[in-house]
Amino acid sequence: MEPIKNLPRLCRTLGYEFKNLDLLTQALTHRSAANKHNERLEFLGDSILSIVISDALYHQFPKATEGDLSRMRATLVRGDTLTLIAQAFKLGDYLFLGPGELKSGGFRRESILADAVEAIIGAIYLDSDLEVCRQLLLNWYAERLAEIQPGINQKDAKTLLQEYLQGLKKPLPDYQVINIEGDAHDQTFTVECRIDDLSQSVIGVASSRRKAEQIAAAQVLELLKK
């Protein structure tokens, strides 16, 4: 199992100092690495994230319908959003993975990264309380909550990027698969996204080409809005 690097540095990145670092260690431990892994914490964190985001949307949009609220919540808590949060925190550098997952690039796999975010939320809840979790999550989600709006459909990142570039009369993005790893039933795709306004390409990694393209597009959007 690969040793965790710098937990205090991760705490600073998360914006939370753990009283019990064992909880954070467990949250970063994949089931391939140890018996005491992060799946129970993930279960807890998933529920906490859902209630915090539901509450925030309910108060932010007093006239929104139940359907609109549900769609906005789904956009904010879905796997690719959590993967982007994990990548911003560089969680892949801190994960405990078994030899097989390490070899297959599990530290980049979107499902493992997304699950680790939920597990960390569960760990923070156990280390503190619901109100601390709420304030921290609202901080993590501040930009996304400020940008989201009710609508019939919550558009995906590729669509939003395409519409953004079309609005500026810019060329559309170019997506290229630059690497495929793993067995046929468990592959990891690395996709490169290039646009004229960015000097460097942006990389997305996921279990399918489509998901990798979405992750790359979402990262490009975040860079363009800075």
UniProtKB/Swiss-Prot annotation:
Instruction: Provide the alphabetized UniProt keywords.
Output: Cytoplasm, Endonuclease, Hydrolase, Magnesium, Metal-binding, mRNA processing, Nuclease, RNA-binding, rRNA processing, rRNA-binding, tRNA processing
Enzyme class, broadest EC rank: hydrolase
Quote the subcellular location field of this record.
Answer: Cytoplasm
Identify the residues that the record assigns to the DRBM domain, covering every copy: 156-226
InterPro entries given for it? dsRBD_dom, RNase_III, RNase_III_dom, RNase_III_sf
* Keyword Cytoplasm found: yes
Q: Which GO terms describe its molecular function?
A: double-stranded RNA binding; metal ion binding; ribonuclease III activity; rRNA binding
Q: Which domain of life is it from?
A: Bacteria
Extract the SMART domains matched here.
Answer: DSRM, RIBOc
CDD domains registered for this protein in UniProt: DSRM_RNAse_III_family, RIBOc
User: So what EC number does this one have?
Assistant: 3.1.26.3
Q: Which GO terms describe its cellular component?
A: cytosol
Catalytic activity entry: Endonucleolytic cleavage to 5'-phosphomonoester
What positions constitute the catalytic site?
Answer: D46, E118
- What is the protein's quaternary organization? Homodimer.
Which HAMAP family does this chain map to?
RNase_III (MF_00104)
Q: Which family does it belong to?
A: Belongs to the ribonuclease III family.
Protein's name in the database: Ribonuclease 3
Organism this protein belongs to: Shewanella oneidensis (strain ATCC 700550 / JCM 31522 / CIP 106686 / LMG 19005 / NCIMB 14063 / MR-1)
